[in-house]
């Protein structure tokens, strides 16, 4: 039986707090993903010759993509620790920890010497800092997602939950604008010599802004209630896998295809356009920028519409579009025409939005309050490994071994079909669950 909330606030005050929460989750995730995307775009454009040069052009690019993917391997560890802390001590403390961790790692990458300066220590240090980024990212999203959704009115969970989601395309837009500006006003030699470091170092400024906003956000109502009832899980991870393993697996599979397709937009398309199609770097960055805007718009729409037609149906529409578009888009990309190249990416984001915007709300509704942070974070982290971790690397290997670009589309379509099946296994009735109170019946009732 659900217990009445002991932390209800007057409507006006709660509205003010909701606005503060939305700003905190949006700004924080935008900064986190700006840091992440700066690395992804650097991996596409400059890290191969600067840190992996002895491996040859193709080998260096593969190593660069591998350095992007390797951080995903520690995401589950970050998710486990963040989930434990978040379920026992609150969502807010995790949001601050992950923000600082990601920012510090990003700034230090901007200070790293290259292979030409310190030899093999350069890629070793790069990978260590990349692991630090991944560890922080493993806990960031779950905290932001839950803070937004657990503060939301029942009929607006999808909309509220879309705010941390649009931090992803917003971070991408910021990173792309930075890279575009540097690429436009610097020669290739200047960019390779020192220009690529600037966006990494700039993250220090963004972290200060994000910390200032997040420190004033109040803890979520349901966690406050659990504290009052002494209902926090003493061992959230054990409780999670004893009774909710199915939900964790479904959460991972639901996210896998969106993450894989998203990382093509984030990183691979820029490299593919410049290295394989001979497009100018500024052209591929323009395409990525416009794609980021499309991703933002359709993600917000996906969260909003999921409150009207349901989470599951919204996901099904998004993944259906990705399945149908994954192969044909390569015939537009391969024209090397900027307009068609950009159009291919924008159409892909029409599928990415509905399969990403409602994710915060869907995940929160899948898990009971006392293990919600652990379940959401670990499901997300595992989905990142299955989907996005090595998507650019797999895409490059498929291209090198088959010689046809649409083979990458087959890979994405198969993943999207798996995610479509997984989300179809989630009961539509979970959308009726009350996330503002600690519900003991929900705690004992898996999907």
Regions from the language model: what does each represent?
Residues 40-41, 245-294, 388-391:
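Extracytoplasmic gate region of multi-pass secondary transporters
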Residues 100-118, 320-335:
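C-terminal ends and interior cores of transmembrane alpha-helices
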Residues 159-183, 379-391:
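Glycine-rich segments within core transmembrane alpha-helices of 12-TM secondary carriers
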Residues 210-217, 413-440:
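Multi-pass alpha-helical transporter architecture, strongest
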Residues 43-77:
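Extracellular/periplasmic helix-loop-helix junction of adjacent transmembrane segments
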Residues 79-91, 299-311:
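Helix-to-loop junctions at the C-terminal end of transmembrane segments
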Residues 312-358:
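C-terminal transmembrane helical hairpin of 12-TM major facilitator-type secondary transporters
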Residues 88-100, 308-319:
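Cytoplasmic membrane-interface "Motif A"-like loop-to-helix N-cap segments
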